Regions:
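Short Gly/Pro-enriched turn/cap motifs at secondary-structure boundaries
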Residues: 90-93, 119-122, 138, 164-171
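A short core secondary-structure module
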Residues: 110, 114-156
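A glycine-rich, basic-preceded beta-loop-alpha segment at the flavin cofactor/substrate interface
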Residues: 152-155, 159, 171-203, 220-238
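Internal maturation/activation junctions in enzymes
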Residues: 7, 52-53, 64-100, 109
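Internal helix-loop-helix
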Residues: 11-78, 120-123
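Glycine- and acidic
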Residues: 15-22, 37-43, 52-58, 66, ...
Length: 244
């Protein structure tokens, strides 16, 4: 199960693989991390989603400040989970249309997020990178910023978990932000045009690794069956149509 897989991975300290050792990471380059993502996905693609989303921390490490590094990166290295909250009911591939609202709370010296995110992989994660509209009156990508939401702060409800065909070990959620406390990651207005672009490049690599791992696992299953299944007094792998 995904829970037992998570327990095994945490015991072996395979989180924060690419993060510096001073934060509790392993300081690996991206290549061995991607190889591990492929292996994990071959064993359990659902857990692979949960585990591989640790690469969201790359974006926080690259664009966050030192205070955010010291507070958040050790938590991911210790096994806490992450998600990237981008998609909305009216903003799928067209992320310029994101309307989840971010307003600055001067009294509390923090940002507040209000709105809905949909189809969020690992939506019950501990730390979320959230794309939100911080510039009032804007309608395009230049009005979007990236925020860090910590589950410990509260203010976000999981309204729905999607009933998917597979990958059940990783919940895909609809999230409702209700005045949720958050903090800015990097600079305002660069959420989509800079930070999400970097975030998605890492995610695409992770999905590719997951796909290769799943394909290899499916091939191994098919090969084992073809060697075991017998028809006309021989294993079906000996028939050219199957062997090819």
């Amino acid at each position: 199960s995904s829970s037992s897989a998570a327990s095994d991975v945490y015991k072996r300290q395979l989180n924060g693989m690419t993060m510096p050792r001073r934060f509790g990471g392993l300081n690996f380059p991206i290549t061995p991390y991607t190889m591990c993502a492929e292996i994990v996905a071959a064993a359990d693609a659902g857990f692979g989603n949960i585990w591989a989303l640790q690469d969201c921390i790359e974006t926080l490490y690259e664009f966050g400040n030192e205070d955010q590094h010291s507070r958040f990166i050790p938590r991911i290295c210790a096994g806490e989970t992450m998600s990237m909250d981008l998609t909305e009911p009216d903003a799928g591939s067209d992320l310029q249309s994101v309307m989840l609202k971010a307003t600055f709370d001067e009294k509390e010296n923090c940002w507040r997020l209000n709105g809905v995110k949909r189809f969020i992989t690992n939506g019950d994660a501990d730390l979320h990178l959230v794309l939100a509209r911080s510039e009032e009156g804007t309608r395009d990508g230049r009005g979007l910023s990236m925020f860090i939401y910590d589950k410990r702060e509260g203010g976000v409800d999981v309204r729905r978990i999607e009933n998917k065909l597979g990958i059940h070990g990783s919940p895909t959620c609809e999230l409702v932000y209700k005045n949720a406390k958050a903090e800015l990651c990097g600079d305002r207005k660069l959420g989509l045009i800079k930070y999400v672009m970097a975030l998605m490049n890492g995610a695409r690599l992770g999905i590719a690794a997951q796909s290769v791992g799943l394909s290899q696992a499916a091939y191994n299953e098919g090969l084992a069956y073809a060697k075991d299944r017998k028809q006309f007094n021989k294993a079906i792998i000996e028939f050219p149509a199957v062997y090819d």
